[in-house]
Regions:
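Bacterial Sec-dependent N-terminal signal peptides
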Residues: 1-23
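Phosphate-group recognition and catalysis centered on beta-loop-alpha active-site segments
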Residues: 19-297
Length: 297
């Protein structure tokens, strides 16, 4: 009888464990300021091997083991949120004009271009399609999309993806509360702060009072004041997010230094030493490989 009971307990343990999704694990890491695991964010998806902000770019990231994708939003003439970085579709599709010039049906007749500018068979995805694709598989960061905060919130509720999506902006806490105070505590919100700008310290102070999961720190020069503010953020219990995309965001500790100059310790290593545990990159596979050598994956 005792053995039978133990088998039953073991069975239910396996069932509960299998119910845990990859996203559950990532969400736990996101909310744990003491986790050693560094979250890798892929800028506009895997845009080197698929069109930026495309479903294929996100599928590639999932297969690669990326932790979070970053995307951008625009709205169509008929009020549908779609993925698009620029104000127009000219650079990234074979069409012309603003997304708001077209209905969704009209917009999806166009084809996305890849990173080399060649037209592909991929179409502009909606935010809802993307949420459903990524559900339980990967975290999502909405970069350009603050103006659609309320619409995004409704879609997150509809698709059951509230726990895995990070919404961000560079606005003050007072403005964000004024704009979206009714749902602010129901979403994962992250402030973006340029630590070189006047008023950065006050922004940090204000946001530490609500202890967001992370603060995105941008800086063109790593002054003692900048390093002090990052320490303050980390000590408050929020994670530090640093972009390694290009030099002006990280005082020269960028992806190209890591990959093209073969100096990852001068780039990603410096970022880790600065206390960051979330890194947004254009070189996700290389960064993942590097982090494994540092036992941070």
């Amino acid at each position: 009888m005792k053995k039978f009971c133990l088998l039953i307990v073991a069975f239910f343990y396996v069932v509960c464990a299998s119910a845990q999704t990859r996203t559950d694990t990532l969400v736990n890491v996101l909310h744990d300021p003491n986790s050693r695991r560094v979250l890798v964010v892929s800028h506009r998806g895997d845009w080197r091997n698929a069109p930026e902000n495309s479903l294929q770019a996100f599928l590639n990231c999932i297969d690669m083991g990326v932790d979070m994708i970053e995307l951008d939003l625009k709205k169509t003439k008929d009020g549908v949120l779609v993925l698009m970085h620029d104000d127009t579709i000219d650079r990234t599709t074979d069409g012309h004009g603003k997304p708001s010039d077209y209905t969704l049906a009209e917009l999806q007749k166009f084809h996305l271009k890849n990173g080399m500018g060649f037209v592909t068979f991929h179409h502009i995805p909606t935010l809802e399609e993307t949420l459903l694709l990524c559900k339980d598989k990967i975290l999502i960061n909405i970069d350009k999309g603050y103006e659609y905060f309320a619409d995004v919130y409704k879609l997150l509720v509809k698709t059951g993806t509230l726990k895995q999506v990070v919404i961000k902006s560079g606005y003050t806490l007072d403005k964000v509360r004024s704009d979206n105070g009714d749902v602010l505590d129901k979403v994962i919100y992250m402030p973006v702060i340029n630590l070189n700008e006047a008023g950065a310290e006050q922004k940090v102070i204000d946001y530490t009072n609500i202890k967001p999961v992370a603060m995105e720190c941008c800086f063109s020069t790593a002054t003692p004041e900048v390093l002090s503010l990052m320490k303050r953020i980390k000590d408050s219990g929020s994670k530090i997010w640093i972009n390694s995309l290009w030099p002006s965001l990280n005082a020269g500790h960028d992806d190209d230094t890591a990959v093209d100059l073969c100096k990852p310790d001068d780039s990603w290593g410096w970022i880790l030493d600065s206390g960051a545990s979330i890194i947004q990159t254009d070189r996700p596979q290389k960064l993942i490989e590097y982090l494994k050598t540092k036992q941070r994956r």
